[in-house]
Amino acid sequence: MIQQETRLNVADNSGAKQVQCIRVLGGTKKRYASVGDRIVVSVKSASPAGNIKKGAVSKAVVVRTKKEVRRKDGSYIRFDDNAAVLLQNNDELRGTRISGPVARELREKEFMKVVSLAPEVL
């Protein structure tokens, strides 16, 4: 459950380390984002050698949340951290690698590139 002002780890090699959510995309009344939802983020910390700088605004997709996500079979899945993957304006990935597991719900939300690059899909 991600909302405005939530800090997330970055799960790709774009150069950003931590981002802060500044808007949840998907309607005027949408307050919370879950796995597979698109958000607008501001980069709060970045590695010096990366191609993205601190203060940059970018779109991202949520890949892990601490709040559990209910699946259709009745099971729940939750992760140890909140994490996102940065996107370019045309919904292409900014990085070329993804670290850590991602949720299977990304496949249903049409983020196949994220699923294919992830080392583990839960």
From Swiss-Prot:
User: What InterPro entries does the record tag this protein with?
Assistant: Ribosomal_uL14, Ribosomal_uL14_bac-type, Ribosomal_uL14_CS, Ribosomal_uL14_sf
Keywords in alphabetical order: Ribonucleoprotein, Ribosomal protein, RNA-binding, rRNA-binding
User: What would be one Pfam family of this protein?
Assistant: Ribosomal_L14
| GO MF | large ribosomal subunit rRNA binding; structural constituent of ribosome
Tree of life domain: Bacteria
User: Which PROSITE patterns does this one have?
Assistant: RIBOSOMAL_L14 (PS00049)
Q: Which GO terms describe its biological process?
A: translation
Gene3D superfamilies reported in the protein's UniProt record: Ribosomal protein L14 (2.40.150.20)
Q: Which cellular component terms (GO) are annotated to the entry? A: cytosolic large ribosomal subunit
Q: Spell out the family assignment given in the record's similarity comment.
A: Belongs to the universal ribosomal protein uL14 family.
Q: What does the function comment of this entry state?
A: Binds to 23S rRNA. Forms part of two intersubunit bridges in the 70S ribosome.
Quaternary structure annotation from Swiss-Prot or TrEMBL:
Part of the 50S ribosomal subunit. Forms a cluster with proteins L3 and L19. In the 70S ribosome, L14 and L19 interact and together make contacts with the 16S rRNA in bridges B5 and B8.
Q: What is this protein called?
A: Large ribosomal subunit protein uL14
Q: From what organism does this protein derive?
A: Amoebophilus asiaticus (strain 5a2)
